[in-house]
Amino acid sequence: MQHESPIIRRKSTRIYVGDVPIGDGAPIAVQSMTNTRTTDVAATVAQIRALEKVGADIVRVSVPTMDAAEAFKLIKQQVSVPLVADIHFDYRIALKVAEYGVDCLRINPGNIGNESRIRSVVDCARDMNIPIRIGVNGGSLEKEIQEKYTEPTAEALVESAMRHVDILDRLNFDQFKVSVKASDVFLAVGSYRLLAKQIDQPLHLGITEAGGARAGSVKSAVGLGMLLSEGIGDTLRISLAADPVEEIKVGFDILKSLRIRSRGINFIACPSCSRQEFDVINTVNALEERLEDVITPMDVSIIGCVVNGPGEAEVSHLGLAGSARKSAFYEDGKRQKERFDNDDLVDKLEAKIRAKASVLDKANRIDVENLED
């Protein structure tokens, strides 16, 4: 069953990306980035909708050219999730997408240009009430910082970030968040820890260029898990060389593991051994695939034998403890009279899980109504 997280989050200011609150205790937002060509409007819209379907709170879109900016205008008209425009080199592109309703501007201090160009972007953002993300990356630091430190260090990344924080402060602009990403876990973690001590603005977390689906997920879970467990972080992106949809799933899994934010089913499943009375692995895989559309937070334990099965089931919303021929079924920690045939588990479990999700959703709605009264 759901348990409260013991994590005490870092205090930060509040900004809004579209209608999504960021910082000051708001739920940690999970975002991804499209990997289509932005000028391919149909493909980009389709990918954004796929990301939104699995729970993306925010989607970032690369806008490298003026042609891409014109495409962004069309994309923005066809989706509802807030969009961040990723801007490098040409500050004029930021000004253009601002006209087209962008929800946030991401600029890279290492290549956006001199202070006068930043001032132009900030003035535009202020006039149109658009927040900015200062996005520092260990692979694209300013030349003078590279020369000063000779290699990326936490101090180098934070100095780059603080240069631009100071510019925004001088321009009296406080609607921004900051990221200091690196592909090395310790470098990224050290950079965020250092930055968290120096500013009050929201922090966007990420291990950049983390790798493929498996290795990148592990690296991100380790790095972001360290920071999140310390209360650091207000938004996150899992950077994978994989389908962006997987980034959202992994992001929510990390938050779910730390009890920070839950979306969908938390399956508690044994790795299986010779004691299993049914095929645990295929059962869990089938249920995960079938139930991707369920967003209700709930714990479901699927354990193949009676050693740990009853204990896990007693602390889950629903649970299955394997036994010969027919397995024991639990609801809200209590064993039910009904038993499930081990050769016909998936359909029955799916039906039970969907029914339980409906009950929990109704209870949550009643709770909210009572609070409003």
Curated annotation (Swiss-Prot):
Pathways per UniProt: Isoprenoid biosynthesis; isopentenyl diphosphate biosynthesis via DXP pathway; isopentenyl diphosphate from 1-deoxy-D-xylulose 5-phosphate: step 5/6
The keyword Phosphoprotein belongs to this UniProt entry's keyword annotation: no
Pfam families named in the record: GcpE
Cofactor(s) required for function per UniProt: [4Fe-4S] cluster
Catalytic activity, reaction form: (2E)-4-hydroxy-3-methylbut-2-enyl diphosphate + oxidized [flavodoxin] + H2O + 2 H(+) = 2-C-methyl-D-erythritol 2,4-cyclic diphosphate + reduced [flavodoxin]
Membrane spanning stretches: none
One record GO biological process: isopentenyl diphosphate biosynthetic process, methylerythritol 4-phosphate pathway
Keywords: 4Fe-4S, Iron, Iron-sulfur, Isoprene biosynthesis, Metal-binding, Oxidoreductase
Catalytic activity, EC: 1.17.7.3
Residues that, per the record, bind [4Fe-4S] cluster: C270, C273, C305, E312
GO molecular function terms attached to this record: 4 iron, 4 sulfur cluster binding; 4-hydroxy-3-methylbut-2-en-1-yl diphosphate synthase activity (ferredoxin); 4-hydroxy-3-methylbut-2-enyl-diphosphate synthase activity (flavodoxin); iron ion binding
Family annotation (InterPro entries): Dihydropteroate_synth-like_sf, IspG_bac, IspG_bac-typ, NO2/SO3_Rdtase_4Fe4S_sf
Note describing how the cofactor binds: Binds 1 [4Fe-4S] cluster.
Source domain of life: Bacteria
Membership in a protein family: Belongs to the IspG family.
Described purpose of this protein according to its UniProt entry: Converts 2C-methyl-D-erythritol 2,4-cyclodiphosphate (ME-2,4cPP) into 1-hydroxy-2-methyl-2-(E)-butenyl 4-diphosphate.
Protein name: 4-hydroxy-3-methylbut-2-en-1-yl diphosphate synthase (flavodoxin)
Gene that produces this protein: ispG
